[in-house]
Amino acid sequence: MSIQFNQVSYIYQQGTPYEFEAIKNVSLTLEQGKYYAIIGQTGSGKSTLIQHLNALLKPTTGSVNINGLEVTNKTKDKHLRHIRKEVGIVFQFPESQLFEDSVEKEIEFGPKNFNMNLKNVKDKAFQLLLELGFSRNVMSSSPFQMSGGQMRKIAIVSILAMDPQVIILDEPTAGLDPNSKHQVMSLIKKIQIEENKTIILVSHDMDDVARYSDEVVVMNKGTIVEKSNPRNLFSQKTQLLKWHIELPKVVKLQKDIEKKYNMLFPKLATNEEEFVKLYKEWHHEK
């Protein structure tokens, strides 16, 4: 399932003194099965962009082609039902949207609206919850007797269990403890690889962006200013400073060592394991 933006602009409160153009003439292609990260300063247009991915917002000008359906400002909502099933969005702090008195009912809510097979959805949700460290009686438990991190995981699983082809995650690990963060991000990566899902991650955590994504889209003032793989992107230190984007911790460490010893590693590490391997190879040859 591919998604293509064709010269898309979106204006909030158009025609009023408060109108604001949040994204400007954006053209972008997102391919099936890839893991994308969308990064940029607060206010750069990231949230507006992702709301076009399942037509929660429609372009003011331009069009978005979602799996063959051309969405413009004239597209009727009745044509968008299938898209909203296939493109799942996990918004920031999704635990605030939980309202059912059991995990099972919470999992069932979305699928009922799409007339999905509830047994299949619940079976998938149960397996995902076990992978995230829940006990086997989780489905009968109340989300409101759980920690904030556990509620976040349940909210995320409620989207994943509907088996969307495209999974959009807006700051999914903000505020989670390191163990929960690792569980969630590892599960998402596993789903991408094993089920050929398209993942779109919006994040200010450059460590996650470097480790998990295949391609990174950089937004600045409503436009796309760069689309590259993490290794190439995080090699552009001067340009990243201009866009107010920090380097991942592992990249900072590598740069510091290269500067201290006046040397260069053969490539830029995008995660700790890769850095350790490069460092050992260099230290052995030294």
From Swiss-Prot:
- Assign the protein's first listed, main location to one coarse class: membrane
> Where along this sequence does the record place binding of ATP?
G40, Q41, T42, G43, S44, G45, K46, S47
Source organism (scientific name) = Staphylococcus epidermidis (strain ATCC 12228 / FDA PCI 1200)
Q: Does the keyword Transport apply?
A: yes
Gene3D superfamilies for this protein: P-loop containing nucleotide triphosphate hydrolases (3.40.50.300)
Family classification: Belongs to the ABC transporter superfamily. Energy-coupling factor EcfA family.
One cellular component term (GO) for this entry is: ATP-binding cassette (ABC) transporter complex
Name by which UniProt lists this protein: Energy-coupling factor transporter ATP-binding protein EcfA2
Q: Which PROSITE patterns match?
A: ABC_TRANSPORTER_1, ABC_TRANSPORTER_2, CBIO
Which cysteines form disulfides?
Answer: none
Kindly give the InterPro entries that the UniProt entry links to this protein.
AAA+_ATPase, ABC_transporter-like_ATP-bd, ABC_transporter-like_CS, ABC_transpr_CbiO/EcfA_su, ECF_ABC_transporter_ATP-bd, EcfA2, P-loop_NTPase
Q: What is its EC number?
A: 7.-.-.-
Keyword list (alphabetical) reads: ATP-binding, Cell membrane, Membrane, Nucleotide-binding, Translocase, Transport
User: Which GO molecular function terms does the record list?
Assistant: ATP binding; ATP hydrolysis activity; ATPase-coupled transmembrane transporter activity
- State the source organism's domain of life: Bacteria
Q: How does it assemble?
A: Forms a stable energy-coupling factor (ECF) transporter complex composed of 2 membrane-embedded substrate-binding proteins (S component), 2 ATP-binding proteins (A component) and 2 transmembrane proteins (T component).
Lineage of the species this protein comes from = Bacteria, Bacillati, Bacillota, Bacilli, Bacillales
* Membrane topology reported for the UniProt record: Peripheral membrane protein
Q: What task does this protein carry out?
A: ATP-binding (A) component of a common energy-coupling factor (ECF) ABC-transporter complex. Unlike classic ABC transporters this ECF transporter provides the energy necessary to transport a number of different substrates.
Q: Where in the cell is it found?
A: Cell membrane
Residues in ABC transporter domain copies: 3-246
